[in-house]
Amino acid sequence: MVLITEELVRKKSEHNERLISTLEEISLHQEDIEVIEHIQNWCRDLKILLLQSNLIARLENLHKLKRLEYLNVAINNIERVENLEGCESLSKLDLTLNFIRELTSVESLCGNYNLRELVLIGNPCVDYPHYRDYVVATLPQLNSLDCVEITPSERLRALRELSKNRSIIVQKQVEQDIERDEQRIRVAKQQSALAEHCAGIEDEEERIKAFWQAKSEHCPEIRTEIARQHRLGRERHETKSPLDPLKPQRNLFAPCGRPYNLNQAKLPFKFRDEADHYLLQLEVYRHLDTSLIDVDVQTTYTRVTVKKKIFQIAYSEEVKPDESTVQRSQITGHLVVNLKKLKVNELLIAKKSPTKSPAAPFDAGKKDGKPEEAFHGGVVDISNICAPEDLPDLI
């Protein structure tokens, strides 16, 4: 059973700097809450309260919320409308997909004179004959019911038939109450038989499979049991056994210390080797938040982490990490990393003489009467003079 604690409320009030006394809106959906408590004492100024997708069985402890305008308790286990008379400012009430059979309980909302919208879709009472006419006539302050606007002619017609419709609905409620009592007994027997069947299964996976394959009815007890099984499944998934095999860690470096080339994210990329820099263009997903991208530029490799997936590329020459730049396109989302090389190839440029001799070309290469190859000047790449050191192939 999940309780509404101060820690939970503060966690959900980050938009208000975790101050709960001045809180005007809070969302406590999908928390498996079974009882509404403490909120009316801690958050007196609440205007919007969202409690959908929980296991709440009863509307209670809300009468002090005088400023509450919107209450959403859809997809819970509520069986009747009650204890909302003190919510004077309530203008919208959402009770979608609950188990409300007692339709006459909506008469408790007659004092909520600010109520304009009521949603009862997905409840058993919606199938009652003259359901809409009865609610429209009982709550004259409503403007819409089940997201459908109420017209003046519809309201007049419903008021004329109110007494007759109410007697029909009361009779239908009695039948539903009898059916509900029988359902409680029937579901209790089914749950007991299922528990005995699952207890005889030793394999945990087979036991879980047997539960989910069993036929069940649509009722509060089954919804609570399903939520409990979901919670147990999450706990089993989060709690790892010490006997479970650990996932092998991916090696990023060779035994000799050389970085590997990796592309776990399977991202297309381009890598250009220019004279004085490297240029890496990584095609990151266009709509990916930049906060999910981490770039680490080192002297011999660059590592880009995209949603915990690693892209790593090594280069043959060292770079200057402090002078490198990282940019991302606002149009395509691509990542561009400009890596300045530490040692740029030295180029020997022969200087041309300031004056040219009018002598013949074959005389320019002679010295002391010996022929010499003419040197016309140009660029010499010294990287080809010495052979590079033997390095193992990159992976």
From Swiss-Prot:
LRR repeats lie at residues 20-44, 46-65, 66-89, 90-110. Residues 128-146 form the LRRCT domain. InterPro entries: CS_DNAAF11_C, Leu-rich_rpt, LRR_dom_sf. Transmembrane segments: none annotated. Residues 264-355 form the CS domain. GO terms for biological process: axoneme assembly; cilium-dependent cell motility; male courtship behavior, veined wing generated song production; outer dynein arm assembly; sensory perception of sound; temperature compensation of the circadian clock. It is found in: Cytoplasm; Cell projection, Dendrite; Cell projection, Cilium, Flagellum. Belongs to the tilB family. This is Protein tilB. It comes from Drosophila melanogaster (Fruit fly). The gene is tilB.
